[in-house]
Amino acid sequence: MELDKETQEKIQELQSYEHTLQNLLMQKQAFQFETNETENAINEVSKSKEEVFKIVGSIMIKTDTEKISKELKQKLEHLSIRLKSIEKQEIELTKKIEELRDEVMKKIK
């Protein structure tokens, strides 16, 4: 079956959107993993009664519990904002993909 140029372009655009969505989902997964790690670190620091250490580069240094707690909470807040942004992009991109897929399917039939 021979497709017209417009349909071929829409198919390429659809493939591009799907590739972008796949990359976005990988980013989302990485941020979710980092969020879980940060939440676990916050929990461990809050229940620790011993000294707390922080890895900086290739060394480990002793740090203040309150200071590291504050840093981790700020990091968690930043991750949360980034995740919300990614989720918004994901919704918009998914909607575009569905619309474009419908258009292409109508042209093919």
Task: List PLM regions with ranges.
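Generic structural signal for short, solvent-exposed loop/turn connectors between secondary structure elements
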Residues: 1, 46-50, 107-109
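N-terminal or membrane-proximal amphipathic helix/coiled-coil initiation segments that transition from
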Residues: 1-12
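Amphipathic alpha-helical coiled-coil segments
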Residues: 10-31, 35-38, 45, 72-100, ...
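Short coil/loop "hinge" linkers that interrupt or connect long alpha-helical coiled-coils or helical hairpins
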Residues: 43-68
